[in-house]
Amino acid sequence: METEPGEKKHLFTNKQLWALLVPVVVEQILNSLMGTADTMMVSNVGSAAISAVSLVDSINVLVIQVFAALAAGGTIICSQYMGQKNTKNATDAAKQLIFIITAIAVVLTVVCVVFQIPLLHLIFGKVEAEVMINSEIYFLYTALSFPFIAVFNAGSSVFRAQENTRLPMTISVISNIMNIVGNAILIFGFHMGVAGAALSTLISRIFCAIVVMYFLRSPKEEICVRDYTKIRPDRHKIKMILALGIPTGIENGMFQFGKLAIQSTVSTLGTAAIAAQAMTNILENLNGIAAIGIGIGLMNVVGECIGAGRKDEAIYYTKKMCLVSEVVIIISCLLVFALTKPIIHLGGMSAESGRMCFFMMTWITIIKPIVWVPAFIPAYSMRAAGDVKFSMILSCTTMWLCRVTLCVVLCRVFGFGPIAVWIGMFSDWTLRGIFYTLRFHGRKWLNHKVIE
């Protein structure tokens, strides 16, 4: 790659770096905002509908996390091959990613559709009849969308490995707009209720998959995948993808199970605490989403550095993006904190819920800029270098010790309110940050060999 005049030779110029990272950050922010708008529209259908959507989405998020993890494995392999300038192997890896992720998604869809009702009863137990009916409808449509989510994730990861992050962002934004417009038409126009929301989601996901596969066929792309029906499994490359994707998938899955355990504890604290925690979760997600986008983009950057044999560059860009992420986190935290009271007021929260929410956001705004970046950003680089098992073990250990166990003890034994959730979270972030910092400077994470 070219370098800017007077600069030390780096694989990426600042211009190239921002061109890669900014679309990923924008995509993450818009997806989060669109998701919030989507939830608000569904909430107008009624309490049974919003309860059903909330319950089913706890399953859907877990499935989507699995696809995202597999896609991340494909991104790492394709990025490293692109760093080697080995387009042929990058293309072969892309084909295998599309094959395996689609196959897994189809199997999941068949299982979820065939065993739809028993699965819902097994996971959620006894719920109100109306909620269960709505859950069955919503789950059916969303399960049908699994292959399309998987294909879009795979296609997007391949484009990101080619440093084209603008196309996945554009497709995602259009898809979210389609989903909201579809909700408006089907929910409010045709009065289809939860089925309208689910159908709109299915259509938007089909759109994503078709468009990303269409552009991936273009001969202009360095990684060009054509004749999808002729793709045959390559056990070696599939094993490479799964070796990276499965540990990340376990890590993401454990996070979702931990989240459910925390929700179960918070639900014992009363309605005001539940509402306060729900709003705090939304606001905390907003102040961190831009930095997460930087981390996702960093995986592609470090993957190329490792593939090119430039381990020094992997270290350089990790440090650089940690600094950028720190600035972004500080600005995001201050901005969201400034909007907290207006949002509490507009959300119609009770005085008690609003007070608890503001108290928790105050501490998040103080603590997050100090401990969040070292707890998460270096981990993206380590995964891109193939150091996925360390991340999985550390993340699962700190989550169950701090986020879950400490939270439960503080709530149930010492009578803490919802702030216990965030004490557990801060402890988790702090421990992660310490161990990731030691791992990063020890440089063992650079010794993994992902590709030949």
Feature names for model-found ranges:
Residues 26, 30, 34, 63-67, ...:
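Residue-level hotspots within pore-lining transmembrane alpha-helices
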Residues 19-38, 141, 175, 204-208, ...:
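Transmembrane helical elements of multi-pass membrane transporters/channels
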Residues 1-24, 78-145, 189-246, 302-368, ...:
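Short alpha-helical transmembrane segments in multi-pass integral membrane proteins
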Residues 50-110, 149-168, 274-340, 372-396, ...:
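Small-residue-rich hydrophobic transmembrane alpha-helices
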Residues 71, 141-160, 168-176, 197-212, ...:
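Short runs within selected transmembrane alpha-helices of multi-pass transporters and secretion channels
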